[in-house]
Structure formats: structure tokens, C-alpha cells
């Protein structure tokens, strides 16, 4: 059992997968200048699948219990709100006092969206890319919006088979929404990447995996490898072998996000149903579990820390030490990443854990 989580078996491999997810994001953001980690955005989609699976599993376990909704939302608040709002306050009000290099004015002018977890809608309607400091918070907004509704659906519908169909139909609706946006020439990165109704594929797939396990369906057992072969081949040929980054977006807009989410869903399914040596070796190792444990703080902190410190380290190394630009960037990225890891460990141990222990009151 996880501390503070009701009736949930602990799967070390899921923490390992969470570690994979955060490392993908870090490689994309902190080492993006190498152009080797263009696929790092997949880390967010893996987070979505894991979140959908774990949250749905918890909701199914507790849906018949007293104070079901209160307990769920209080646990959610205790996990997300303290660190989220601490970082928000720090970035909005303290960073500008000590550092004027980051453009925080965009967020100050539109801060109501951030306080209400609706900033991804803001990013869709008003271009945020000139001020990236808190852009990564979009994924937290998508999750919170989904979980405002999903617990009520589970409470009302109850039956896992019906919930599975609802999840599937929602997944199809997301794909149709993206196709329609493309058809009407709303070919905008923000719509495809940040819009709630085009980016909940992973959460839906994760929910479906939890429901498939609940009803003990054999569909994945029978067709798993066929699905993996087709989707992995499709993604490899159309996405990874495509050197033109601009032409990858149409594929993602139509089916790419969904196909990657399904592959991650199968990975989660294997992580919780197989106790194989390979799964343990790949995902239940101490290194990935460590990064999985600190993943929330690491995700929240890494981007502001990078934007604050990376230019300073790079300029110091290229100026004072006359290093080549590429070498200076690489060393600076490593230093900044280590600093973010240290901050995340301190945050988990001395800040987040205080609130995580309170979750036991709402089990």
C-alpha cells in the first residue's frame, strides 16, 4: 500500500515509469539544444496515462464508501495545491524582485487563469510562447479539469463495463475533435498540444487500463502484441523517421497522441500484471524509482530553475572560461539539472511529505 492512498497495491514499476516520464521531459527542456530529444514531450503523455490509471483505480476502490468525493478531492488538494501554489507565488512575486531577465508580466496580467487551473485555455487563446516560465503548468491544468468531472461519472455510472465504454467514447471524441480542428484549418500548436479536449487521450487510456483490469477482460492478453506491433511500427515510421518536425504535427493531430497513449497504456498494464525480471530490471530499479518519487517537484521546479540559471552558467563558461558554445551549454544544462534534483529532494522531504502524511486522514 502507498501511504495515504486507500486500498491500492504499490507497484514499484509504476514509480519507475514515472521516473521515465520526468526524465523525458527534462531531456527535452534542459537538453533540447542538442536536438536529440525532440520526443521528450512523450513524458507528459506517459504522466497522463499513469495518472488516469492510478486515479481511476483509487476512485473504483472508494466509490461505495462514505465521503467518497470529499476524501478524493482532499487527497488531490494535499498532493497538488501546496507545491503548485508555492511555486506560483515564488514565480509571480519573488522572482521579479531578484531577477528581471524572465518575462513574468504575461502571467501577472493573466494570473487568474493560473490560480484556477485553467491556464491551458489561456495559452490556447493568447500566445504564451514569449514568456515560457510557467508554460509547463498546462498539463497540471488539464488533469485538474478532468478530475473535476471524472469522480462524479464513476459515482453515477458505477458499473466498470459502462465506464469502460464511456472512456472509449471519450477517447474517440478527442480524436474527432482534433480532426475537426484540422479540417477547419485551426492548425495551431496550442490547440493540438494544450487544449483540454485534444490532450486527454492519455488520461482516458489510463482509465481504460484500470477498468479492463477491474472487469478482468482478456482483450489485451489476446491482442496486445498485435497492437504493439502495429502502433509502434506506425509511430516509428511516421514520427521518428520523419526528419521534418513541422510535418510531424498533422500525424499527432490525427492519431499520433492516441497511438502513443495506447502503447503507454499497454506498458502500464504489463507493469501491474507481470512480475517478470525484465519489468523489474527496466522499471523497478532504484534509479528510476528515485526519479519517480521526486517527479512532481522535479516537474514543477525544473523549468523556472533552468530559465533562471542556464543563461548565467552558459555566459560564465563562454565568457570567463572561453569554452566553446556547445560544451558550455552541455555543462550548464548538467549543473542546472543537478540543482533542480537537489531542490526536488529537499522539497519532497521537508515540504511535500508534510502534506502527504495528512492524506491518511482522508483514506
Residues of each region from the PLM?
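Acidic/histidine-rich catalytic neighborhood
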Residues: 209-211
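Feature representing long, continuous alpha-helical segments
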Residues: 253, 257, 261, 265-269, ...
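Juxtamembrane membrane-water interface segments of multi-pass membrane proteins
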Residues: 279-281
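Hydrophobic alpha-helical transmembrane segments in multi-pass integral membrane proteins
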Residues: 236-242, 297-312
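Alpha-helical transmembrane segments and terminal signal-anchor/GPI-anchor hydrophobic tails
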Residues: 221-276
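Membrane-cytosol interface segments of multi-pass membrane proteins
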Residues: 1-202, 214-229, 273-277, 287-289, ...
Amino acid at each position: 500500500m502507498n501511504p495515504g492512498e486507500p486500498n491500492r497495491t504499490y507497484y514499484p514499476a509504476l514509480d519507475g515509469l514515472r521516473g521515465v516520464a520526468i526524465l523525458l521531459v527534462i531531456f527535452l527542456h534542459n537538453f533540447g539544444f542538442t536536438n536529440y530529444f525532440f520526443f521528450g514531450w512523450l513524458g507528459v503523455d506517459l504522466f497522463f496515462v499513469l495518472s488516469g490509471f492510478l486515479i481511476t483505480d483509487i476512485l473504483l476502490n472508494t466509490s461505495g464508501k462514505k465521503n467518497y468525493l470529499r476524501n478524493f478531492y482532499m487527497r488531490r488538494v494535499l498532493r497538488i495545491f501546496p507545491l503548485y501554489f508555492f511555486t506560483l507565488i515564488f514565480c509571480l512575486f519573488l522572482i521579479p524582485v531578484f531577477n528581471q531577465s524572465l518575462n513574468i508580466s504575461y502571467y501577472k496580467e493573466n494570473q487568474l487563469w493560473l490560480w484556477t487551473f485553467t491556464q491551458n485555455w489561456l495559452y490556447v487563446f493568447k500566445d504564451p510562447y514569449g514568456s515560457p516560465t510557467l508554460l509547463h503548468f498546462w498539463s497540471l491544468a488539464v488533469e485538474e479539469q478532468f478530475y473535476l468531472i471524472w469522480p462524479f461519472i464513476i459515482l453515477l455510472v458505477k458499473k466498470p463495463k459502462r465506464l469502460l465504454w464511456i472512456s472509449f467514447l471519450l477517447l474517440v471524441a478527442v480524436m474527432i475533435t482534433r480532426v475537426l480542428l484540422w479540417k477547419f484549418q485551426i492548425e495551431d500548436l496550442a490547440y493540438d498540444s494544450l487544449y483540454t479536449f485534444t490532450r486527454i487521450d492519455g488520461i482516458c487510456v489510463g482509465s481504460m487500463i484500470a477498468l479492463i483490469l477491474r472487469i478482468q477482460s482478456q482483450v489485451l492478453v489476446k491482442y496486445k502484441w498485435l497492437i504493439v506491433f502495429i502502433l509502434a511500427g506506425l509511430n516509428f515510421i511516421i514520427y521518428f523517421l520523419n526528419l521534418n518536425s513541422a510535418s510531424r504535427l498533422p500525424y499527432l493531430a490525427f492519431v499520433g497522441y492516441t497511438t502513443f497513449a495506447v502503447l503507454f497504456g499497454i506498458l502500464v498494464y504489463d507493469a501491474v500484471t507481470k512480475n517478470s525480471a525484465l519489468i523489474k530490471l527496466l522499471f523497478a530499479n532504484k534509479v528510476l524509482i528515485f526519479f519517480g518519487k521526486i517527479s512532481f517537484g522535479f516537474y514543477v521546479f525544473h523549468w523556472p530553475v533552468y530559465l533562471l540559471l542556464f543563461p548565467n552558467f552558459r555566459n560564465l563558461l563562454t565568457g570567463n572560461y572561453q569554452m566553446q558554445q556547445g560544451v558550455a551549454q552541455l555543462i550548464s544544462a548538467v549543473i542546472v539539472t543537478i540543482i533542480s534534483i537537489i531542490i526536488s529532494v529537499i522539497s519532497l522531504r521537508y515540504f511535500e511529505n508534510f502534506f502527504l502524511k495528512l492524506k491518511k486522514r482522508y483514506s
